[in-house]
Design a protein with these regions (language model features):
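Cysteine-dependent hydrolase recognition
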Residues: 11-295
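Bacterial Sec-dependent N-terminal signal peptides
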Residues: 1-12
Length: 295
């Protein structure tokens, strides 16, 4: 693979071999992750380039979110950046005084711990118009940085680019090994001839505050992103928790499908547990008893 490497103010840019024309993409990672997963990250960069998406890799020993955002804005202005993926240990903005823009999360910020009552959000990085006032860095979890949404900031979200994170889970396995394995799978999948044309989306109890009005537009969003999925009947399937009293079997049967390309879950849960549904709606006491026995 041909690429060039440029070091600028401590950040190192691994430039794409493909010339940037209309758009580009960036992998933002930390120095340790890049050194441990260089082969896999460059393979990912190469496969995206072959598909027509010039991709930068930028790594550094990041000290604060502002440093990351400067790089993103620079690439956006100079190279028509359309999106980024944060890989490894990238600073996490913990936002306060912004709960009016969350879909459901509400917690008293005055009487609860900062860590619990703040919102970790990468809107700090991908919505360039939002403005923030820095408060402090967490003294225990050094990757957390607390900000207030500034009074003079826009009070609505309009992202300029898309963003995502690839972060290892704390399950006892070496973090870089997890990330390496993930990108090997990603590259292998990109090299197959299997088109992404079979998707399944499930919405659990409590998601979107159980609002049908909020849930319905998902089909339009996915149609915009993956129009080919809707060319034939049965390629896109959507299930809500209240389509049946006990949807667990329906969900499992969907996940067993050998032709399934993508599953999307909107649920509440814990790191090792997902809540598929709640108790079936009923006004009869014996139905409540039956539900308790079932669970």
């Amino acid at each position: 693979m041909l690429c060039s490497i440029l070091s600028l103010r401590a950040q190192t840019f691994v430039k794409p071999a493909v010339k940037v024309k209309d758009t580009s993409f960036a992998v933002i990672t930390d120095k340790g992750t890049f050194q441990a997963c260089e082969t896999e990250l460059k393979a990912y960069q190469e496969i995206l380039g072959k598909e027509g998406l010039p991709t930068f890799i930028v790594y550094n020993e990041w000290k604060k979110p502002e440093d990351v955002k400067k790089v993103i804005v620079k690439l956006y202005k100079k190279d028509n950046l359309e999106g980024v993926v944060f890989v490894g240990d990238i600073p996490i903005p913990m936002l306060r005084k912004a709960q009016h823009m969350t879909s459901a999360f509400k917690m008293d910020e005055k009487n609860n711990d900062w860590r619990d009552s703040s919102v970790p959000s990468d809107r700090f990085y991908d919505d360039f118009d939002l403005q923030f006032d820095f408060l402090k860095q967490d003294s225990v979890e050094n990757n957390f940085f607390y900000y207030n949404l500034a009074i003079k900031s826009p009070q609505q979200i309009r992202c300029d680019i898309y963003s995502a994170r690839v972060k290892a889970v704390d399950n006892g396995e070496e973090p870089h090994a997890q990330i390496s394995r993930y990108f090997k799978k990603v590259v292998a999948e990109h090299q197959t001839n299997n088109k992404l044309d079979q998707i399944f989306s499930y919405t659990g109890d409590g998601s979107y505050s159980n609002s049908l009005t909020a849930w319905t537009p998902e089909t339009f969003t996915i149609r915009e992103q993956m129009p080919g999925v809707f060319d034939k009947e049965g390629r896109a399937r959507f299930i809500r928790y209240n389509f049946s009293d006990y949807p667990k079997d329906d969900v499992i049967n969907m996940l067993k499908r050998t032709d399934l390309d993508l599953s999307i879950f909107h649920e509440h849960g814990m790191p090792e547990r997902q809540y598929l549904s709640g108790s079936p709606a009923t006004n009869r006491w014996n139905a409540h008893v039956d539900a308790m026995k079932y669970y």
